[in-house]
Amino acid sequence: GEYWIDSIPPHWNEYGICKGNMRGGLVPPLSGEYHNDWKDSNGAWIRTEIWAGMAPASPDTAIRYAREDACVDHGSGEGTYAAIFVAAVESAAFVLNDIRALIDIGLSKIPEKCRVAQSIRLLLDCYDNGVDWKVCRNRLVEDSADLGWFEAPCNVAFAMLGMLYGEGDFKRSMILAINCGDDTDCTGAT
């Protein structure tokens, strides 16, 4: 917690809320829960590359680090589940290049009923049934409309949509993920 207060410059959204909570005496994961309307957002899963890089081919180690990091500003929200999912995918990607197998690894690490898993399963259903990527994108948006914009379930699915529908073509994967819209710096970077 002290590192966050002293070294993390942003004061907006989940970052500012968790820092304020810690200054008020709450420790993680409560710092990411209390009065935090952003606990389902994207701030944690976009930081997971470091944990995967520190634990290549070791998803369980990567998700341990990701969970410790994510709970500070996302508590037990969907943002933390997204970080766990993405850290597992990225860590396993050091030794696997089968996108579907990577997604299955990520899904195996998060609760089946969480919204991140729900969005990923909807994506897989669309892909497996030959649904056009734009239609799939719209279904993902509709499915998570109650959460609002800049939320992890839909945006993680957008990143995975790019990889699935891109079918191994890096440029196409990037274009698809970014063209889904919403938090495009997150979806494109992942």
Question: What is each residue range found by the language model?
Answer:
Residues 1-29:
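Well-ordered mid-protein domain cores that form the structural environment of catalytic cofactors
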Residues 44, 79-87, 181-190:
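Alpha-helical transmembrane segments that form the membrane-embedded catalytic/substrate-binding core
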Residues 2-7, 40-44, 149-150:
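Short low-complexity stretches enriched in small and charged residues
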